[in-house]
Amino acid sequence: MQLVSKIARTIGRVLKLNEDLIEAISLGHDIGHVPYGHFGEKILSELCEKNGIGKFHHNVQSIQFLDVIENCDLTLQVLDGILCHNGESHNKNLKPTGTLSWDSFQSKIEAIKGKEKKDPFPVTIEGCVVRIADTIAYLGRDLQDAIEVNLIPQDLNIIPKKCIELFEIKNWKEINWSVLDVLIKDVINNSYDQDSISFSDDVSMSIQEFYKFNMENIYNSEKLKKDSAKIRFMYTTLFEHFMADLDKENKESLIYPDMKELDWISSEYKKNTTRPEIVRDYIAGMTDRYFEFVFNKITIPDRVKRRYT
């Protein structure tokens, strides 16, 4: 989140854009991400569909948190930028698209949730900057992190040669810095005094190669998949447990003090939200660490302490 903000503000400052808008979009863009990343999102989406509330989308969930649950009264420009921030979908050129209206914004939400799985562009140039910063932020960082935790070897020869040359990578400890430096400068050079935010042709092609490498060696790694059954079990356990607690109105359940009874949650939300939606929002708002804490809390008996006299 902070890295995306720094990258986007750096680009926005040189291009003389609205840095406050860029900062607001950046800080809210990943609020909807769930425990255990993309695999966690996949499982939660399946559970949501099974319970009749449709697929889960982390960008739509960010809007759910900020505009529905907490009713933060953010501007339409900020909400639109957060909704359309998806930098994982690579685009060589990003140009503001659509009209700035609440009806248009709602149509974008429905398009994302629909069968065609559309991925709309932001309506502001600042939103486009954040989206391209999202692409820049994770590309080199994910690879360097994967090397640091021994997910892949410390061997630059396994990285596509074109990427090594273009990003001028000298050793694995400088991967992220090298990628950031080249991509930020390229975006600025190709976007200055333009009505869109763009990469050059060579850089855009290298990004696609880099992403393909990361997908095969990191995101779809067999080492990461080995715990997938455990994560699925944890998600299913939590979802079913809290659904049952809401059915029984079990006020001792964590979902009541953590979610349902919070005084800063919108009264409209409390009145109009279904049980599966409440459970979805509760789980989606957890960090990995709290997710694990809650799972242990509801599955492991409390230890009875012996008293010595």
Give the role of each language-model region.
Residues 1, 32-33, 51-55:
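Short secondary-structure transition/capping motifs
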Residues 3-11, 15-20, 40, 55-56, ...:
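Histidine-centered, transition-metal-coordinating active-site segments
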Residues 28, 32-36, 137:
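Short active-site segment of divalent metal-dependent hydrolases/proteases
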Residues 24-25:
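Active-site alpha-helix of zinc metalloproteases
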Residues 37-50:
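A glycine- and small-aliphatic-rich helix-loop capping segment at beta-alpha/alpha-beta transitions
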